[in-house]
């Protein structure tokens, strides 16, 4: 009997149904329990996994590496200096070669087209560890964290504040719409998500009943939120836009005043961040921003980051469990005839 997931790639959330995404979230929670209990789950024994990184990473690389090892697979890291995608060798040729040697491929880089071509030509499952457009592996971890905290996904209100046209905003909007989560993007008009992404989300919301909102009004956007979510103000490759972004996004910083505007501080409220976070001056970027712009915190204050509302480290750990679920489901020959 065919498995729902076997042999499939995870390139963008919109390629998966609500039931499939819910299954991956629940399977992630199950594998986390096995890990905590010390129960082996070597579903990928003898498999070899290529980890392709055009963009640097702490969490994604660590999560894929430990997840692969826990599953009994051997991960092989190939950094930007090790791969020639489109430079000295076409993506197609690279994909064919890697597909003949590895059983699965993770890609973290810039172009969505590259990860799609890897999947098209390699003949093995390919997992998108982040592109400029989508971040699907992060989504399974994020909604896993939401479900662990609230016991459900449907009807939860998640508000993303910050740069509304980056990959995190895209993925949260579309994935939430698929899962029946009410998603609001609260951002300056200049940084609203693209019409293409909004239209994807609207179509999914019609089916799931999710309520969507795109607004530049902070008070309106965050009122009644269960989850406040933010990300760095400047994405990788956009470092020249620091000044522009700092000036645009200052009003969208997650701070205690914003939490009060949710009118839910005494209820069910958590704060998520995919990390790294610029919540103090203990980084080179933090020092530079403090020196140039006179602010010691960017997208989230240190007070909120370290408060009882912060779930960012729980969320980061869940990257490993969710990536494990994704790889096991798509490569592990598991009996999943339906979801």
From Swiss-Prot:
<dbReference type="InterPro" id="IPR006131">
    <property type="entry name" value="Asp_carbamoyltransf_Asp/Orn-bd"/>
</dbReference>
<dbReference type="InterPro" id="IPR006130">
    <property type="entry name" value="Asp/Orn_carbamoylTrfase"/>
</dbReference>
<feature type="binding site">
    <location>
        <position position="231"/>
    </location>
    <ligand>
        <name>L-ornithine</name>
    </ligand>
</feature>
<dbReference type="GO" id="GO:0019240">
    <property type="term" value="P:citrulline biosynthetic process"/>
</dbReference>
<feature type="binding site">
    <location>
        <begin position="274"/>
        <end position="275"/>
    </location>
    <ligand>
        <name>carbamoyl phosphate</name>
    </ligand>
</feature>
<feature type="binding site">
    <location>
        <position position="167"/>
    </location>
    <ligand>
        <name>L-ornithine</name>
    </ligand>
</feature>
<comment type="function">
    <text>Reversibly catalyzes the transfer of the carbamoyl group from carbamoyl phosphate (CP) to the N(epsilon) atom of ornithine (ORN) to produce L-citrulline.</text>
</comment>
<comment type="pathway">
    <text>Amino-acid degradation; L-arginine degradation via ADI pathway; carbamoyl phosphate from L-arginine: step 2/2.</text>
</comment>
<feature type="binding site">
    <location>
        <begin position="135"/>
        <end position="138"/>
    </location>
    <ligand>
        <name>carbamoyl phosphate</name>
    </ligand>
</feature>
<dbReference type="GO" id="GO:0042450">
    <property type="term" value="P:arginine biosynthetic process via ornithine"/>
</dbReference>
<feature type="binding site">
    <location>
        <begin position="235"/>
        <end position="236"/>
    </location>
    <ligand>
        <name>L-ornithine</name>
    </ligand>
</feature>
<dbReference type="InterPro" id="IPR024904">
    <property type="entry name" value="OTCase_ArgI"/>
</dbReference>
<feature type="binding site">
    <location>
        <position position="108"/>
    </location>
    <ligand>
        <name>carbamoyl phosphate</name>
    </ligand>
</feature>
<dbReference type="Pfam" id="PF00185">
    <property type="entry name" value="OTCace"/>
</dbReference>
<keyword id="KW-0056">Arginine metabolism</keyword>
<dbReference type="InterPro" id="IPR002292">
    <property type="entry name" value="Orn/put_carbamltrans"/>
</dbReference>
<feature type="binding site">
    <location>
        <position position="84"/>
    </location>
    <ligand>
        <name>carbamoyl phosphate</name>
    </ligand>
</feature>
<dbReference type="InterPro" id="IPR036901">
    <property type="entry name" value="Asp/Orn_carbamoylTrfase_sf"/>
</dbReference>
<dbReference type="GO" id="GO:0016597">
    <property type="term" value="F:amino acid binding"/>
</dbReference>
<keyword id="KW-0963">Cytoplasm</keyword>
<dbReference type="GO" id="GO:0019547">
    <property type="term" value="P:arginine catabolic process to ornithine"/>
</dbReference>
<dbReference type="InterPro" id="IPR006132">
    <property type="entry name" value="Asp/Orn_carbamoyltranf_P-bd"/>
</dbReference>
<dbReference type="GO" id="GO:0006526">
    <property type="term" value="P:L-arginine biosynthetic process"/>
</dbReference>
<dbReference type="GO" id="GO:0004585">
    <property type="term" value="F:ornithine carbamoyltransferase activity"/>
</dbReference>
<feature type="binding site">
    <location>
        <begin position="57"/>
        <end position="60"/>
    </location>
    <ligand>
        <name>carbamoyl phosphate</name>
    </ligand>
</feature>
<feature type="binding site">
    <location>
        <position position="319"/>
    </location>
    <ligand>
        <name>carbamoyl phosphate</name>
    </ligand>
</feature>
<comment type="similarity">
    <text>Belongs to the aspartate/ornithine carbamoyltransferase superfamily. OTCase family.</text>
</comment>
<protein>
    <recommendedName>
        <fullName>Ornithine carbamoyltransferase, catabolic</fullName>
        <ecNumber>2.1.3.3</ecNumber>
    </recommendedName>
</protein>
<keyword id="KW-0808">Transferase</keyword>
<dbReference type="Pfam" id="PF02729">
    <property type="entry name" value="OTCace_N"/>
</dbReference>
<dbReference type="GO" id="GO:0005737">
    <property type="term" value="C:cytoplasm"/>
</dbReference>
């Amino acid at each position: 009997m065919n498995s729902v997931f076997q042999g499939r790639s995870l390139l963008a959330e919109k390629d998966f149904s609500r039931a499939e995404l819910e299954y991956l979230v629940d399977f992630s929670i199950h594998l986390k329990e096995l890990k905590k209990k010390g129960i082996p789950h070597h579903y990928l024994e003898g498999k070899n996994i290529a980890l392709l990184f055009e963009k640097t990473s702490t969490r994604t690389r660590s999560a894929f590496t430990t997840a692969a090892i826990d599953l009994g697979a051997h991960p092989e890291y190939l950094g930007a200096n090790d791969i020639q995608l489109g430079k000295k060798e076409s993506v197609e040729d690279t994909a064919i070669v890697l597909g003949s040697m590895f059983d699965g491929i993770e890609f973290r880089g810039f172009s969505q087209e590259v990860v799609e071509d890897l999947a098209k030509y390699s003949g093995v499952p390919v997992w998108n560890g982040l592109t400029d457009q989508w971040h699907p592996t992060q989504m399974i971890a994020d909604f896993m964290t939401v479900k662990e905290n609230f016991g459900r996904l449907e009807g939860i209100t998640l508000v993303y504040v910050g740069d509304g046209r980056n990959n995190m905003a895209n993925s949260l909007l579309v994935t939430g719409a698929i899962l029946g989560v009410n998603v609001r993007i609260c951002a300056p008009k200049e940084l609203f998500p693209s019409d293409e992404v909004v239209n994807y989300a609207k179509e999914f919301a019609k089916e799931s009943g999710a309520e969507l909102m795109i607004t530049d009004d902070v008070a309106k956007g965050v009122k009644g939120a269960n989850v406040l979510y933010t990300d760095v103000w400047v994405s990788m490759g956009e470092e020249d836009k620091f000044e522009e972004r700092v000036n645009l996004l200052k009003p969208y910083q997650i701070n205690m005043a914003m939490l009060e505007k949710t009118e839910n501080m005494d209820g069910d409220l958590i704060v998520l961040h995919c990390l790294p976070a610029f919540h103090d001056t203990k980084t080179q970027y933090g020092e530079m921003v403090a020196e140039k712009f006179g602010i010691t915190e960017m997208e989230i204050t240190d007070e909120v980051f370290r408060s009882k509302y912060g779930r960012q480290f729980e969320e980061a750990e869940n990257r490993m469990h969710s990536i494990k679920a994704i790889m096991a489901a798509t490569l592990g020959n598991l009996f999943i005839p339906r979801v």
